[in-house]
Each structure stands twice: as structure tokens, then as C-alpha cells.
């Protein structure tokens, strides 16, 4: 108790003067083209804007004018800003899942359905309300279908990962109420290497799960304008070490009180999380023709993963707990073309498309296939980027998505179905010096067709939805380096296939899921106020947001048991979300060649569903403070993360204890070109028992215990 109190105090002590974490969009430094799909933004930094600290790779800087990754449409990104991780931060934080890789960013938590299936949670939103993309189009998997389904994007392949919010998110769909996560890689090259061959790689070892992983990629110029790309990666983990018992304290007390010896034995599971091992491999090849701003290319890749889902233990001796494993395979083909149209109304045209053949098996403990998921789909988008004239800019485009989805097996919970979706979008911007404005609109038509299915007892069903969304934003520079913003949005989201048609046992989530075919559009209003500032040696940022929902769709346990599984059912009601994010950094000293910086992050979400009380799985208040010593070749960092108790819970939820976690890292760039680095890190140094309230499995699967890691990234 004393140690937790001291550590929590340390977290607060690091925050004064930096109570707003590194609001890098307050430092309008242009984002350089890294060859990963990020196009350099216009360099419009003012003299008052603080330069980044020497050797600082903690957070990729943002610009007041950005180019949204995967899109050439420029916008001032007013509503909430873009956060990007790359370089050493990505090397240090990369994990087997996207959610765990991003969980230190402001406003970001993770669904933590075990270490292998963890999606980002943005401002309390997860699942269908967070879009996960690769280079601007969807992952084309079924990860949003259920919390146990992993995203078929390996973070090891990423050159940069961006988190987008605000009007720019409407470029990618009306469902991205929480935001968009865009993973950038170089599988379709965007530049011709200046060397005979360009090679990137990363090797990682982590002690908590005996993690062994590696990725290597090569770009080879062929002739004057052609580039060939190949990459491959492999990762393997054992069952993950944890900082205490597998069962949360309340469940463990119930297990200890049981008269059944087998149930009492569950209370003794500690130190290791059973059924959490994984093995993943991924290979890809691509090629592109590149001439100035014009390029056309394609890639093909195959992703394969076998991983365990932590066991949801039953304290009823009559019910056997399952230890499911998922076997995922996806073959994907992607294409991209960018055409510089020169002068005139249009500046450029970008075409992007992808096709995916995906399947996964949910395996019983015996190895038999319990359920099979098959998804074949394709997505295409075209963007027409306007030339900037007299401060006006922007663009417009169209997007189409099709998916055929089938579930088969003893635990089938969805009928065979198809989805067709057409989206039309536009983003317009205005730059008048101190004043900048932005407006975006999107129309989206979604059609679902579900087959009649006697197994789950539903007739043939067809639903059509027409959703219209719009967002407005304005910012004003009140002083050199300081700007305020006010933004508003109106969004409509079509329900997902699962929210409409689910009706049956789902072995992966160890629950019985029930949808509602009568669910209507989910509609919301949102407003946000921001302040960003930067000066010599500091950055500062804060935002407060409030969203009102009409017909909010949510899944919650009912307390009933069916087929020996807890029943989770989808409902619709009005709801309200509000919260804040704080971010900042300050340079406090220079000792020799080292800049000493303090930084901090704080975030909080409060969510209520009308007639039901608190929304389920909402992350509690979090504060994170760090001290970092930075030089041209060596960086050292110690940080303390304090997470509050979550006692504001939905029906049938249990409270979640808070925790205080200490992490440290040391990075070294051995060569003068600073293109390669070695990172040593120690996470959860004191081996605390930590659980995320956003996780369906938080009472059965805590976070990783002490994890000592070494990563080496090389480029030549």
C-alpha cells in the first residue's frame, strides 16, 4: 500500500508544469516523408514554435497543416489532432497487437482480450466505433466482429502508426466516432532508394512471454523508376507472466469459498496466464513504378497467426471452462496509384484498393475446429485533391466496400451474410493566416443481406441504412505559438452485422451473443474545445469533449445463462460521453550533451446510458508522467503511470482496482547516421497486478507482469 501511494505521488509530481502531455500538434514542424506512405506537410512553422529536442523520437511531430496518411487531402486537422508514433518510440513500444502498441498515447486504452487480441480503445470507444486501416483502407478482417478476433495487421511491419480524430476521420467512414488508427508500411514503395538496396529490420526479445520476434524488409531499385519490395516477419510467445493471481480478488474469494476442490484450485493460478501463447508469421512482396509525384504499384501478402484466448473460468462445477485458440490466415492484394494532374482545379488523383481472402478457425481444447469464419471482401477508394487557391483547399472522393461473410460450426452465432457499402465524402479547408477553418461531410449507404438459417433460427433478413455525417472546425492563433479551437460534429452510424443478427454461442468470447434486427441508425452530436501552445523548450495542449447519442448501440451481460454461457445482448438507448485529454512537455535543464525533459499525459472519460447508468467498459482516470534525458546518440527515460479505480460500473460489471506502474528505457544509436538503434526497456518494474476495465476478460486475464525487453532496429 505504501509503495503504491509513493508511486502514485511520483506520477503527480512529474505532472505540474507539464500537466498537458506532449501536444506535438502545437509544434508545427513538417512531417518528413519516411517512405512509409507519409507525405511531407507544408513547412509553415513560425519562429515562436519550439523545435523538437535533440534526438527526440518520443512522438512524431505534427503540423498545423498535415497530410492525412493514406490520403493526399490536406487539412489543418482541427477537431482533435493527429498523433503519430515512429522511430525509437515505435521500436520501444511495439507489441504483438495494435492495441498494446498504442496504449500509452493520450486518450488511448486497449481492449486487452489477452495479449494477442487487443484493439485500441479511443476516448472510451472500441469495436465498430474505431476504424483500423492499413495505408488508408480497412484491414479487411473480422477483428471488429468480436473482441477475441485479432487485427490481421502485424505492428512489426509498421513504419509509422497514426491516430486520427476529427473532420479528417470522416474521409474513412461514419463509424469512426472514436477515431481512426492508420498503420503505414512500405509494401507498396513510394520512393526510389538512393542506394543499390535499402534494408530495414527489427529484432525483439521480451521476457514476460519469452517473446521472440523479427522483421526484415528490402527495397531494390530495378531500372530507373521501378522498385521491388519484399518483407517477412515471425514472432512467437509463450504463456505470459503476470504480476499476481489470474482471478481478480472478488472472483478469487468466491473460488476459495467453494466446496469443490477443482474450483478452489482456480484461486491458486498465479504467475502465468494460461492459454495466452501465440505464433505469427507474415510475408509480403510488392512493386511500384515511381516518377516524381506519380506512382503506381501493388503488393501481395499472407498473414498467419495461431494464438490462445485466456480462459474465462466458471465457478460453477457443472460448467466446463473452455480454452479456445484461434487459427487465422489472410491473403491480401493491394494496389495504389497517385497521379499528379499539374495545374488547374485538381492537384492530384489517388486511387487505392484492396482484396482479401480471410478465414479463421476457433479451436477447441482438443484441437478440433469448433467454429469456422470465412470472409472475402474488397475495398476501393478514389480521392480527388483540389489545388490550393487563395487559402482554399481540400478534396472529395468516393469509397466502396463489399464483404461476403460466413460462420459455420457447432457454435455458429451469425447467419451467412453480405455487406455492400458506398461512401461519398468531401473535406474543405480555409487558411486565413491566424484563422483556419475546416468542414467535412460524408454520405454512406449500407446494405446488409442475411440468409435464412435454421440453426440459429432467423429468417432471411435485409436491412438498408443511409447515414449522413458532417463536421465543422475553427481555430485561431491568439499569440505566437498559441491557438484555440472549437469544433462540432453530427454523425450517423449504421449498426454492424453482429449488432443486428448475432444469435448463438461464441466460443472465442465464451459468451452467448444476441443481436437485434430492429436496431436503427446510431446518431450523435459532438463538440470539442482545444488549446495548443508551444514555446522555447515546452509544448502544451488540452482538449475537452462532449458527445450526445440518440440510439447508442451497446452490448451488455443480461445475467442469464444459455448453453452454459453468460448471455450478452445488444440494446439501443440514448447516451452521453464527455471527458478531457491533457498533454505537455517542458525542458528543465541541459547537462552536458543531454536535454532533460519532463512530460505528462492525462485522460478521462465519463459515459452514461439513459435508463441503464454507466456505460460498460469505460477506462478510468489515468495520469502518466515521465522524465527523459535526450542527446544525439543516447536517450534514457523513466515514467510512472497511475490508473484510478473504476467503481463507476454498468449492470453485471465488477469494479476494477487501479494500479501504479513504473517503466524505464534506454536507447542507443550506435552509428553517426542515427538510422539504427538499440532499445533496452523494463516495463512494470515492480511486477504489479494490473487490469484494464475496458477488457471483457479483465477479471480473468491481468496485464503483463515485469517485462524486460531488448529491441534492435537497423537500416542500411
What are these regions (language model features)?
Residues 394, 435, 539-549, 566-646:
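Gram-negative outer-membrane beta-barrel transporters
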Residues 207-236, 247-306, 329-340, 384, ...:
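Transmembrane beta-barrel wall of Gram-negative outer-membrane proteins
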Residues 274-280, 293-349, 355-377, 410-418, ...:
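Flexible loop and strand-edge segments within Gram-negative outer membrane beta-barrel domains
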Residues 315-317, 321-336, 340-342, 460-477, ...:
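Outer-membrane beta-barrel signature, preferentially recognizing the C-terminal barrel domain
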Residues 138-167:
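Short acidic/polar hinge/loop motifs at secondary-structure boundaries
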Residues 89, 98-101, 118-121, 130-133, ...:
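N-terminal periplasmic accessory domains that precede
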Residues 25-91, 99, 127:
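Short, acidic, small-residue-rich periplasmic hinge/interaction motif at the N-terminus
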Amino acid at each position: 500500500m505504501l509503495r503504491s501511494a509513493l508511486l502514485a505521488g511520483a506520477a503527480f509530481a512529474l505532472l505540474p508544469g507539464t500537466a498537458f502531455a506532449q501536444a506535438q500538434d502545437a509544434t508545427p514542424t513538417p512531417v518528413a516523408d519516411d517512405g512509409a506512405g507519409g507525405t511531407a506537410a507544408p513547412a509553415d512553422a513560425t519562429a515562436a514554435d519550439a523545435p523538437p529536442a535533440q534526438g527526440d523520437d518520443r512522438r512524431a511531430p505534427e503540423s498545423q497543416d498535415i497530410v492525412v496518411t493514406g490520403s493526399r487531402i490536406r487539412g489543418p486537422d482541427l477537431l482533435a489532432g493527429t498523433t503519430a508514433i515512429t522511430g525509437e518510440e515505435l521500436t520501444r513500444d511495439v507489441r504483438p497487437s495494435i492495441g498494446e502498441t498504442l496504449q500509452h498515447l493520450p486518450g488511448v486504452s486497449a481492449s486487452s482480450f489477452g495479449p494477442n487480441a487487443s484493439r485500441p480503445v479511443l476516448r472510451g470507444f472500441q469495436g465498430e466505433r474505431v476504424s483500423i486501416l492499413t495505408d488508408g483502407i480497412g484491414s479487411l478482417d473480422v477483428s471488429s466482429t468480436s473482441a477475441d478476433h485479432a487485427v490481421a495487421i502485424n505492428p512489426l511491419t509498421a513504419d509509422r502508426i497514426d491516430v486520427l480524430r476529427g473532420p479528417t476521420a470522416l474521409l474513412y467512414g461514419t463509424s469512426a466516432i472514436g477515431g481512426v488508427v492508420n498503420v503505414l508500411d512500405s509494401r507498396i514503395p513510394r520512393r526510389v532508394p538512393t542506394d543499390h538496396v535499402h534494408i530495414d529490420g527489427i529484432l525483439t526479445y521480451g521476457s514476460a512471454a519469452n517473446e521472440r520476434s523479427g522483421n526484415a524488409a528490402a527495397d531494390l531499385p530495378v531500372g530507373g523508376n521501378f522498385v521491388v519490395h519484399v518483407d517477412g516477419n515471425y514472432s512467437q510467445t509463450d504463456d505470459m507472466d503476470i504480476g499476481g493471481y489470474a482471478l481478480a480478488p472478488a472472483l478469487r474469494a468466491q473460488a476459495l469459498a467453494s466446496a469443490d476442490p477443482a474450483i478452489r484450485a482456480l484461486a491458486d493460478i498465479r504467475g502465468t496466464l494460461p492459454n495466452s501463447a501465440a505464433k505469427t508469421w507474415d510475408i509480403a512482396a510488392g512493386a511500384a513504378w515511381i516518377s516524381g509525384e506519380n506512382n503506381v504499384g501493388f503488393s501481395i501478402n499472407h498473414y498467419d497467426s495461431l494464438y490462445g484466448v485466456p480462459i474465462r473460468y466458471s465457478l460453477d462445477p457443472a460448467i466446463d471452462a473452455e480454452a479456445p485458440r484461434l487459427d487465422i490466415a489472410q491473403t491480401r492484394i493491394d494496389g495504389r496509384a497517385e497521379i499528379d494532374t499539374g495545374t488547374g482545379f485538381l492537384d492530384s488523383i489517388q486511387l487505392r484498393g484492396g482484396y482479401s481472402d480471410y478465414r479463421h478457425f476457433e479451436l477447441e481444447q482438443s484441437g478440433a475446429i469448433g467454429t469456422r469464419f470465412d470472409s472475402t471482401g474488397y475495398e476501393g477508394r478514389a480521392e480527388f485533391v483540389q489545388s490550393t487557391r487563395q487559402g482554399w483547399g481540400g478534396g472529395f472522393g468516393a469509397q466502396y466496400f463489399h464483404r461476403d461473410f460466413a460462420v459455420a460450426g457447432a457454435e455458429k452465432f451469425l447467419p451467412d451474410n453480405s455487406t455492400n457499402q458506398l461512401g461519398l465524402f468531401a473535406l474543405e479547408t480555409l487558411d486565413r493566416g491566424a484563422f483556419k477553418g475546416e468542414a467535412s461531410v460524408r454520405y454512406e449507404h449500407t446494405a446488409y443481406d442475411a440468409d435464412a438459417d435454421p440453426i440459429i433460427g432467423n429468417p432471411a433478413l435485409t436491412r438498408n441504412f443511409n447515414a449522413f455525417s458532417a463536421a465543422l472546425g475553427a481555430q485561431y492563433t491568439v499569440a505566437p505559438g498559441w491557438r484555440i479551437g472549437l469544433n462540432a460534429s453530427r454523425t450517423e452510424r449504421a449498426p454492424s452485422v453482429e449488432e443486428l443478427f448475432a444469435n448463438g454461442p461464441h466460443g472465442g468470447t465464451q459468451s452467448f451473443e444476441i443481436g437485434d434486427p430492429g436496431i436503427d441508425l446510431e446518431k450523435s452530436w459532438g463538440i470539442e474545445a482545444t488549446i495548443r501552445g508551444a514555446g522555447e523548450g515546452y509544448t502544451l495542449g488540452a482538449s475537452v469533449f462532449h458527445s450526445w447519442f440518440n440510439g447508442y448501440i451497446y452490448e451488455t451481460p443480461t445475467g442469464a445463462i444459455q448453453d452454459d454461457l453468460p448471455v450478452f445482448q445488444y440494446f439501443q438507448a440514448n447516451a452521453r460521453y464527455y471527458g478531457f485529454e491533457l498533454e505537455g512537455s517542458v525542458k528543465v535543464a541541459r547537462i552536458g550533451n543531454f536535454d532533460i525533459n519532463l512530460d505528462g499525459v492525462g485522460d478521462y472519460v465519463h459515459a452514461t446510458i439513459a435508463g441503464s447508468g454507466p456505460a460498460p467498459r469505460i477506462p478510468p482516470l489515468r495520469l502518466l508522467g515521465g522524465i527523459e534525458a535526450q542527446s544525439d546518440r543516447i536517450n534514457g527515460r523513466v515514467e510512472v503511470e497511475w490508473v484510478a479505480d473504476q467503481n463507476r460500473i454498468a449492470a453485471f460489471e465488477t469494479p476494477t482496482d487501479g494500479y501504479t506502474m513504473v517503466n524505464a528505457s534506454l536507447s542507443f544509436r550506435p552509428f553517426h547516421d542515427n538510422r539504427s538503434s538499440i532499445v533496452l526497456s523494463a516495463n512494470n518494474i515492480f511486477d504489479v497486478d494490473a487490469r484494464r476495465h475496458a477488457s471483457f476478460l479483465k477479471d480473468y486475464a491481468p496485464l503483463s507482469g515485469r517485462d524486460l525487453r531488448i529491441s534492435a532496429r537497423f537500416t542500411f
